[in-house]
């Protein structure tokens, strides 16, 4: 697994986490476990 981390800078920036199946979106802190979802979802 992995841990959702949102301590990077920027507003509303979607960043992929070190784990290939994790990504987070700011500012709503939505985490996705599916890489395809990470790539297709627009950042809030």
Curated annotation (Swiss-Prot):
Superkingdom of the organism of origin: Eukaryota
PTM: Disulfide bonds.
GO BP: defense response to fungus; defense response to Gram-negative bacterium; defense response to Gram-positive bacterium; killing of cells of another organism
Keyword Disulfide bond: yes
Keywords from the named record: Antibiotic, Antimicrobial, Disulfide bond, Fungicide
Reported function: Antimicrobial peptide. Active against fungal species B.cinerea (IC(50)=5.2 uM), A.niger (IC(50)=2.6 uM) and B.sorokinina (IC(50)=5.2 uM) but not against F.oxysporum, F.graminearum and P.debaryanum at concentrations below 10 uM. Inhibits growth of P.infestans at concentration between 1.3 uM and 5.2 uM. Active against bacterial species P.syringae, B.subtilis, X.campestris and C.michiganense.
Record's protein name: Antimicrobial peptide 2
Taxonomic source organism: Taraxacum officinale (Common dandelion)
Lineage: Eukaryota, Viridiplantae, Streptophyta, Embryophyta, Tracheophyta
């Amino acid at each position: 697994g992995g841990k959702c981390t949102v301590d990077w800078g920027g507003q509303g920036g979607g960043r992929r986490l070190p784990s290939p199946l994790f990504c987070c979106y700011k500012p709503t802190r939505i985490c996705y476990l599916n890489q395809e979802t990470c790539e297709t979802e627009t950042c809030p």
